[in-house]
Regions:
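Membrane-helix boundary/interface segments in integral membrane proteins
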Residues: 95-111
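Core segments of transmembrane alpha-helices
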Residues: 11-18, 64-75, 122-131
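Membrane-embedded alpha-helical segments that form the functional core of polytopic membrane enzymes
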Residues: 15-58, 74-94, 140-155
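Juxtamembrane helix-capping/reentrant segments at transmembrane boundaries
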Residues: 1-2, 45, 49-70, 106-122, ...
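Helix-loop junctions at the membrane-solvent interface of multi-pass transporters
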Residues: 21-25, 80, 105-106, 132-136, ...
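Active-site His/Glu-centered metal-binding helix of metallohydrolases
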Residues: 14, 40-48, 65, 69, ...
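C-terminal membrane-associated helical module and adjoining short loops/tails
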Residues: 2, 15-16, 32-40, 110-173
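N-terminal membrane topogenic signal
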Residues: 1-11
């Protein structure tokens, strides 16, 4: 746990409440800066872990959890501010729980379902879309495009996880 990538992941988790406090205080530019730092730290911890062979079980679990915490916190803020419809967040939550359930079934079979490229694209698209919504909150067109990008990449990646790993269900007992 004392690796640099794990420390970066922990910092991202700590940045989450800082982001929320700033956003809910109406300090959107500072909240945006914290959000961008958190997003960039997501890229940094993964890069460092791979480059210096510091991949850990802690990082495999906490890194995606930190991403979900940040993204879902931003989405909750956008629901409350009227920038994002609740149904879009419900789709994201459904996909996250469904893929997590799929991974749990796979673990029972001593299998690991690695992150798919579509999942990485979904995370990047979501982080960029939410950042755009934060930076330009009054531009409705940006909100519409951002929500569409989030929903489309979320649904696509969720379907791909289940199609590629459908054999998990045939082996389930």
């Amino acid at each position: 746990m004392n690796t640099l990538p794990n420390k970066i992941t922990l910092c991202r988790i700590v940045l989450n409440p800082v982001f929320l406090i700033l956003a809910y205080q109406g300090l959107l530019l500072p909240a945006f800066v914290v959000y961008i730092i958190a997003c960039l730290s997501d890229m940094a911890d993964g890069y460092i872990a791979r480059k210096y062979n510091q991949i850990s079980n802690f990082g495999k679990f906490m890194d995606p959890l930190a991403d979900k915490m940040l993204v879902l916190s931003a989405m909750c803020f956008f629901i409350e501010s009227g920038q994002m419809p609740g149904w879009a967040v419900a789709i994201v939550l459904f996909r996250e729980f469904a893929v997590s359930g799929l991974r749990l079934i796979a673990v029972e079979q001593n299998r690991v379902i690695a992150a798919a490229w579509s999942g990485k694209i979904k995370t990047a698209a979501t982080m960029i879309a939410l950042g755009a919504m934060m930076l330009l909150p009054s531009v409705k067109f940006i909100n519409i495009i951002a929500v569409a990008a989030i929903v489309i990449t979320t649904v696509y990646s969720g379907i791909e996880y289940f199609v590629v790993n459908k054999d998990v269900f045939t082996e389930a007992k």
